[in-house]
């Protein structure tokens, strides 16, 4: 049987970087790791709640966390930050205050910044969110995938593979459907490949969306 490895973990140190950067004593390591998870979940929930309704998705590509002795630096990479900023101009300060209070950071100052990514639809997380919104609105899965591939091609990607698994279009038997365009070298470590796995809850049950994007 073929063993499937996470494409991002497979390329750490070559084309992928860690999303959390800090040192910790072995006894405190698990606590720090859980804190990172909670910070990411909290930010995702906050953005989901306060994003402009018309946008339909959060548009978060990734959240990077760096910890020093006196500072926790959180960078939110977003495709469409204006949707959040238009709704709540003071949103970042409010998020920072709430997060500081929630996690009781002690001596560490919390600093949050938002960075806009150049080509949002060249990012698999944002693309997966786009497909998820389409599926929730009962758009045909094939139509949703084709539109996502078009958007990815406009973002100058060299190849993309989209896979959806579950009770597609409400069918009784779960199945896996996938479409690939261009080159997607999943076994080449040197290949700059980005990946996202995204669950979406529809009226028929949970569907799993996986996207591989070959950048260069």
Swiss-Prot record:
Chaperone recorded as keyword:
no
Name the Gene3D superfamilies on file: 3.30.300.20, Ribosomal protein S3, C-terminal domain
The record's CDD domains line, in alphabetical order, gives:
KH-II_30S_S3 (cd02412)
Cite the entry's keywords alphabetically.
Plastid, Ribonucleoprotein, Ribosomal protein, RNA-binding, rRNA-binding
A Gene Ontology molecular-function term? rRNA binding
Q: Which GO terms describe its cellular component?
A: cytosolic small ribosomal subunit; plastid
Name of the protein in question: Small ribosomal subunit protein uS3c
| Species this chain originates from | Cuscuta reflexa
Q: Which gene encodes it?
A: rps3
């Amino acid at each position: 049987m073929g063993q499937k490895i996470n494409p991002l973990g497979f390329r750490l140190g070559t084309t992928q970087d860690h999303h959390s950067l800090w040192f910790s004593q072995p006894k405190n390591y698990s606590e720090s790791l859980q804190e990172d998870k909670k910070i990411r979940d909290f930010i995702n929930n906050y953005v989901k709640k306060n994003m402009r309704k018309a946008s339909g998705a959060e548009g978060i590509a990734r959240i990077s966390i760096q910890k020093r002795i006196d500072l926790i630096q959180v960078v939110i990479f977003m495709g469409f930050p204006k949707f959040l900023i238009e709704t709540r101009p003071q949103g970042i300060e409010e998020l920072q205050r709430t997060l500081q209070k929630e996690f009781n950071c002690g001596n560490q100052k919390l600093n949050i910044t938002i960075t806009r990514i150049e080509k949002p639809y060249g990012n698999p997380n944002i693309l997966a969110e786009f497909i998820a919104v389409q599926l929730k609105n009962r758009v045909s899965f094939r139509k949703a995938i084709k539109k996502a591939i078009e958007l990815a091609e406009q973002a100058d990607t060299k190849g993309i593979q989209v896979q959806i698994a579950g009770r597609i279009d409400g069918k009784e038997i779960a199945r896996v459907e996938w479409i690939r365009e261009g080159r997607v070298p999943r076994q080449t470590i040197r290949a700059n490949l980005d990946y996202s796995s995204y669950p979406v809850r529809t009226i028929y049950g949970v569907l799993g969306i996986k996207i591989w994007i070959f950048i260069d």
